[in-house]
Amino acid sequence: MIYVSLFIVAFTVATIIPFGSEAYFITLLSLGEYNNLLLLIFVSVGNVFGSLFNWICGFYINYFIKKSWFPINNKMIERGNKIFSKYGKWSLLFSWVPLIGDPITFAAGTLRYPIIPFLVLVSIGKVGRYLLIYLSIIWAFKFF
């Protein structure tokens, strides 16, 4: 069940909720009670799926923008489109960066960037980030 909760947290933070999944991931790693590889997989997949959700919302922007509950505003759309247009597909490698990651993944959907290359680039960035966190924690526990 802890893996599912980690997936949900990682998914949620990759959408529009402004908090980090890193603290939860690090806490679970630090406890030493769970399979580290499964923690890495669940946090990574959850976070990538959250970005996929953003892409889908961007792809169907004309439907969602009319909904009162939709949290993305025109300013966020413009910011994401500007970054994505300036740096192209490579900006997706930075989809994990706070404040710019969500607008970039959303912009990729609004600009109809193909889903397979989207998933590959986002996965490289997000899995790479969590892998770096994982390796840092493992290293820290060896020396401290």
Model region roles, listed by residue range:
Residues 1-5, 31-103, 110-144:
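Membrane-interfacial helix-loop-helix
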